[in-house]
Amino acid sequence: MSLYGTMRTGVSGMNAQSNRLSTVAENIANANTTGYKRASTEFSSMILPSGNGSYNSGGVQTEVRYSISQQGATTFTTSASDLAIDGGGFFIVEGANGQEYLTRAGSFVPDSEGNLVNASGFTLMGYEYEAGVDPTVVVNGFDGLTRVNLASDGLIAAGSTKGSMGANLPSGAPVGDVSTTSLVVYDSQGNTRILDFNYEKTGANAWTLEIVDRASGDALTVPPVTLAFNAAGELTTSPATVVANGALIVPPPATGAVVGSITIDFSKTTQLGYAFNADGGSIDGNAPSKVAGYQIDSDGIVYVKYENGKLDPRYRIALANVQSPDKLRPESGNVYSQGVDSGVIITGFAGSGDFGEILSGALESSNVDIAEELTAMIESQRNYTANSKVFQTGSELLEVLVNLKR
């Protein structure tokens, strides 16, 4: 047995326990850090070749591992911009250097420019979004991503572009009978305009629909739309839409505001043995309204919310994942970058594939268990002391060997 080998083994053990104490200290320090993932020290033996009749003590080496795939507890808050992921995936954030990173730390707040940034200063990334149209995702990269910005637009108005109007037309009405209903629409400045829908019976199972701007008296459908019905009173006209081209026909008021082209869906129109009855219709657009806040749903769609109750979709938050999350490379600020063994980064949306759902008004706590860390600290302290005794014993034996010549 080599005395120097014994001492080296003791030093190896002390270094290993020192590394373990370092991870324990880091875990305890970050126990309250949002989205922090516990670090642990794994030990493996080092074996040295031995000769006949002798044994060379080896040592121990350590490797730090991170429990990145282990989800922490969810705590709920009153801020809509606090986000947590219930399931797999990471938020994609941008650092001050313009580099994209992954994180589970979702304590986002708007900065002075309206960008959503977390406590470490990283900016949340997503895709610009239009209602009903999913953005095109580059599944293995970050191309097309933009900063999620909630800067207030102040007062905002939207002109009407599409709507619907359904009605039952009385089958027993005489030819020439006219039934009228109306629909409020919005011009380009959010002013309300009234469109009258005039239904005139022209023959058996046949009617015409004329849409008229009430203020000017001008028809927006030239010529009137012909409506035809079968014996069951079902509409057979195809397509069951009409474009009320107000931009060309309605004279603009003194403000210069105009009613643009509005596509009206009349597919719910019927002809039955019942009195004229309109379904009330629907229209998009809105009058001027102030921003009242924002809302983020479980699919990651970010809406600006106005005082009139209108929700305007602006962004869809992107998520990313890898095949081996525990092999991601930790960076300062509680973020991660792609590691050598983590696998390629896959980009997608919450609620699809292996991605979890986004919880608004919630944060993911660290996955550190203080009781376990304190236990590990005591174990490491005792093991460090034991390894120091090995070193001390080897030193004392070496001193005995040196004193033999005296």
Curated annotation (Swiss-Prot):
Organism, scientific name: Rhizobium meliloti (strain 1021)
List the Pfam families hit by this protein, alphabetically. Answer: Flg_bb_rod, Flg_bbr_C, FlgE_D2, LlgE_F_G_D1
In which domain of life is the source organism classified? Bacteria
Q: Which InterPro entries match?
A: Falgellar_hook_FlgE_sf, Flag_bb_rod_N, Flagellar_basal_body_rod_CS, Flagellar_FlgE/F/G, Flg_bb/hook_C_dom, FlgE/F/G-like, FlgE_D2, LlgE_F_G-like_D1
Name by which UniProt lists this protein: Flagellar hook protein FlgE
Q: Which family does it belong to?
A: Belongs to the flagella basal body rod proteins family.
Subcellular location per the Swiss-Prot or TrEMBL entry: Bacterial flagellum basal body
**Could you tell me the Gene Ontology terms of the biological process aspect for this record?**
bacterial-type flagellum-dependent swarming motility
According to the UniProt record, one GO cellular component term is: bacterial-type flagellum basal body
Q: Which PANTHER family match?
A: FLAGELLAR HOOK PROTEIN FLGE (PTHR30435:SF1), FLAGELLAR PROTEIN (PTHR30435)
Q: Which UniProt keywords apply?
A: Bacterial flagellum
Source gene?
A: flgE
Q: What is its main location?
A: other
